Design a protein with these regions (language model features):
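Histidine-dependent nucleotide/RNA phosphoesterase domain, centered on the 2H-phosphoesterase fold
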Residues: 1-228
Length: 228
């Protein structure tokens, strides 16, 4: 199922490349005016081995050499979204919710959750971004997501998860398109070279519940709870 989702993205990317019909994110031109904020449970890739991160950065750098004007997620902001608890909403503020209640549920669920291991192999893309494909090695991530969904809902807390789509993948976004692509076919060829590239594996043991903007920029992010 996860591979089918990645393949569906890839098919749309090929069409966008052939037609030069990319979806450019104008918010990335002026981040300071973007007021969209949300609540997310996540884990950062930086806790992984150096070799895996080096491989990801190597690919990201290769893209940057041919498309220097796009947006590149910094290494320390690369993340795996466990659950988008409240999807980013314009002008959303922390004083609208009881953050302790969310933190309590987060801690309750994570206490009984094992580490999450993800295999990173291949890249896929869409008309608006490029991601590294992640594949959980077992059902621990799925169980964690479902437990968070259940307990947050049972607690009667404000949530919007699964409003756009039910999160089942383990991808990490690394490039977003904000300006016209200068050479779509060259970019496509590079992505094809890495379509099945083995980046490595990461065992995630540290998790956070954060208040964030759309791009998980650390300058905006506020940690509400952490578990390790």
């Amino acid at each position: 199922m996860i591979q089918a989702i990645y393949d569906g993205m890839w098919d749309k990317f090929i069409i966008a490349s052939d037609r030069n019909e990319y979806e450019l994110d104008k918010h990335l031109i002026d981040l300071e005016s973007d007021t969209r904020r949300g609540i997310t449970a996540l884990t950062y890739l930086k806790q992984g081995s150096g070799s895996t991160l080096d491989e990801i950065v190597k690919f990201q750098t290769a893209v940057q050499e041919i498309e220097p004007k796009q947006y590149y997620h910094p290494l320390d902001e690369l993340h795996l979204t466990v659950l988008s608890v409240i999807s980013c909403i314009p002008a959303f503020e922390l004083n609208e919710i009881n953050t302790k209640s969310y933190a309590d549920v987060f801690h309750s669920v994570l206490r009984s959750s094992p580490p999450i291991e993800v295999k990173y192999q291949g890249v896929t893309a869409s008309p608006n971004c490029i991601v590294v494909q992640g594949f959980p090695v077992n059902d621990a991530l799925e169980k964690l997501r479902n437990n968070l969904r259940t307990q947050l809902t049972d607690a009667g807390l404000r949530v919007t998860f699964d409003s756009r789509y039910k999160l089942v993948t383990a991808h990490s976004s690394i490039v977003r398109f904000r300006l016209p692509i200068s050479d779509g076919q060259l970019l496509l060829a590079l992505c094809q070279q890495y379509r099945n590239h083995k980046f490595g594996r990461i065992v995630f043991t540290d998790f956070e519940l954060v208040f964030n903007n759309w791009y998980q920029n650390l300058a905006v992010t506020k940690s509400l709870a952490s578990h390790s």
